[in-house]
Amino acid sequence: MRSGLFGVLRWTAVGLVATLVASLALTACSGSAAGEIVYVVDGALGTYNTNTIVGAASAGAQAFARTLIGFGYHGPDGQIVADHDFGTITVVGGVPLVLDYQIADNAVYSDGKQVTCDDLVLTWAAQSGRFPGFDAATQAGYRDIANIECLAGQKKSRVFFVPDRSVVDYEQLFAATSMMPSHVIADQLNIDVTEALLTHNATLVEQIARLWNTTWDLKPAVDLRRFPSSGPYKIESVLNGGAVVLVANDRWWGLKATTKRITVRPQEADIQDRVNNRSVDVVDVAVGSSGSLATPDNYARIDSPSAGIEQLIFAPQGLLAAAAARRALALCTPRDVVARDAGLSIANSRLSPATEDAIAAADGAREAGQFSKADPAAAHDALSGETLPVRIGYQGPNARLAATVGTIAKACAVAGISVSSVTLDSSTDPSGPQALRDGKIDVLLASTGGATGSGSSGSSSMDAYDLHTGNGNNLSGYANAQVDNNIGALAVSADPAERVRLLADSAPVLWADMPTLPLYRQQRMLLMSKTMYAVTRNPTRWGAGWNMDRWALVR
């Protein structure tokens, strides 16, 4: 989503107001500001790099939105807000699109190394699809960049887009959590990363990709020198059980973090006990994932729609690789019941999923009609009377998704489809997408991109790449030239009429091939202490963590 001057001013004002409110609260209340806040998120925190397939599906973006910053961040409505603490973007040319990126002169990592244009080059190379070996979640936007001019060690770069590929939502690129510290890889390999990438040195590119994929994996006793921060917080430690402790970054050049320490903890089965004994302060998870979580008197709860769609994502291999098998499971899935149990309407859109508007509502509505209610007879016929065992997996614990699998299993049994539920424990199976890729399950029940949380970038044209050939989080391995062309066209079109045409052209193909089955829009629950200040919702995968450096808890 592009943000105009009004949007930038509006959300800059929101940040200032949040800071002012927190300051006034601390002044007015008899209590004092807490030194630590405990923040509970949906999924695992297995990597610092939220741009890998596993990282994008994790809760990493919620945790590290103010640890690895960029030229923009996602505000409370999911829109991009320019982050001038980090730098500025200037449009130099429109056709083709040319952008100048200027990193702030005082931008420095927590280890003392400068933030430079080398970080942009690595970000582009890893996610452009042009360099082999990178396990990137998405190529959206980056694949349309033709070249980046960067003198190693400098703070300015010029980005040239491919002619006729003026990406509408270019502000999504090089934003918070997208830019990893390239000097960490440069120091490990003792090379100039920018030179190696821009000269396409195949041997070095392979080594760079391997480290980009793995060097930022998080585990207890990890070498924290590999995890420098460019934001108000930095990692202090990784705890047993997967929690990550963030502390104020003393080298941060902007407004200092209000709270000095935030422990980010993945949701566990004992969440109700933790809330009851006030050992957690902010809970930012999918509605229903924690069951019927009771809200104590000293907590406030806000539910709101996310930009992500809960869906069935079919494996590219095994029994569900065949379109007939996928359609059979879709035919017996009672989407109306599943959505009703979640208190929601059925979602149909695959290529316009991030927002609830007239365009998204119309996307695929006609083609989806036969898949709204369970039709076990049609499912049986689609399989020619054969039986079909199906393993549906989801990241647990998650009461809502467990119930959904049970509903599908009951409805599909009549059709000869035996559905078994597979709970993926974050301690042993940290990634639903990885389990799907490894063949441990036939279907992944998750949100956009296979995420436990929202999973969405906040931009429908970016999220649509989940079904583009070769995209990392195209978990079903779907490939269709017509759909690819339409996804590419959506990324460069701001014309509503053209977008409607492209969606209408894609819907019959997608509902026939059935790479995924959308169910309903994931709802988010934000539960917090009544003495918490400046915590606000966010429909994207960055969640409430988008402004955690402004949070204040009064004891």
From Swiss-Prot:
The subcellular location is: Cell membrane
Query: Which residue(s) hold a covalent lipid per the annotation (N-palmitoyl cysteine)?
Result: 29
UniProt KW keywords: Cell membrane, Lipoprotein, Membrane, Palmitate, Signal
GO molecular function, a single term: peptide transmembrane transporter activity
Is Membrane included in the keywords of this UniProt record? yes
Which residues, per the entry, are lipid-modified as S-diacylglycerol cysteine? 29
**Under what name is this protein listed?**
Uncharacterized lipoprotein ML0489
Q: Which source organism does the UniProt entry give?
A: Mycobacterium leprae (strain TN)
